[in-house]
């Protein structure tokens, strides 16, 4: 608003106040029902086949580095996935971890019999390989599902815990050792293409100046910033913590390798080079 001298004004409608369900957002913005959306790419499985590589386990580092990687990816090898939209930015959250109501995960056997919420197709595939029963649902449904016993826990990043008071509903928190986190998932901040094209050159410049890798990096930094405070709240709520390492971590990574292998095969069947996409994503994160 400031940079456009009041010409660009946005109205926010959280919690799907304009109707529909979260998976419908990408169609709403493409069709012009809304002008801008911020959503999880994984809510529409199969819609963004290249970008979904960033859902794979043991790929992300921190959100700051991974967000810049995913933005560069979508500007280059993954551009086809978002060709129908004006991309403002694509970013990720900090690596997610496992949170349960009571049972602290210390080994592969501890997953058996647990109903755990997974946010994306790759995350639910990993949970299944680990022996858990995966349950898919958007983040706002996690708290009531925990309260009603629909799920025993979930895999989410620390940052969203306080927003839904999940630290009060889960007491056991398990992370993985090493520089690569258990998982992350891309968020899309995208705009209706026709709406963008209808703007004046000066207005477009304002949007362009506040888009791309710098915005993705800023978003990643914010997620990283709130990781520690959220963990502190869980500790104050009486939470117990464990970091998987050694033999248990090796077993979990074997299960993760199966998820990665299956994703590459699936991508190849779609006419993509799954191995190249995976190697590119990994290299961009390591830059």
Locate each region found by the language model.
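Signature of the catalytic double-stranded beta-helix
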Residues: 68-81
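N-terminal secretory/targeting leader peptides
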Residues: 1-64, 80-287
């Amino acid at each position: 608003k400031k940079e456009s001298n009041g010409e660009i004004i946005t109205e926010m409608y959280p919690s799907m106040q304009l109707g529909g369900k979260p998976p419908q957002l990408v169609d709403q913005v493409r069709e012009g029902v809304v002008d801008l959306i911020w959503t999880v790419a994984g809510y529409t499985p199969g819609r963004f086949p290249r970008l979904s590589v960033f859902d794979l386990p043991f790929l992300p580092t921190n959100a700051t580095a991974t967000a810049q990687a995913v933005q560069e990816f979508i500007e280059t090898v993954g551009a086809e996935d978002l060709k129908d939209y004006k991309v403002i930015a694509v970013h990720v959250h900090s690596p997610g971890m496992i949170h349960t109501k009571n049972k602290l995960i210390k080994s592969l056997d501890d997953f058996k019999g647990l109903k755990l919420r997974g946010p994306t197709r790759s995350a639910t595939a990993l949970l299944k390989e680990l022996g858990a029963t995966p349950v898919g649902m958007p983040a706002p449904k996690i708290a009531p599902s925990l309260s009603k016993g629909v799920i025993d826990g979930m895999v989410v990043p620390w940052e969203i815990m306080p927003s839904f008071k999940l630290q009060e509903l889960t007491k056991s928190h398990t992370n993985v050792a090493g520089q690569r986190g258990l998982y992350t998932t891309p968020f899309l901040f995208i705009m209706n293409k026709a709406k963008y094209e209808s703007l004046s050159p000066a207005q477009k410049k304002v949007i362009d100046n506040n888009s791309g890798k710098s915005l993705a990096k800023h978003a990643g930094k914010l997620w990283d910033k709130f990781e520690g405070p959220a963990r502190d709240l869980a500790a104050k709520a009486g939470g117990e913590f464990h970091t998987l390492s050694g033999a248990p971590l090796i077993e979990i990574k074997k299960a993760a390798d199966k998820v990665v292998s299956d994703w590459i095969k699936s991508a190849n069947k779609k006419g993509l080079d799954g191995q190249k996409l995976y190697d590119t994503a990994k290299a961009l994160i390591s830059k």
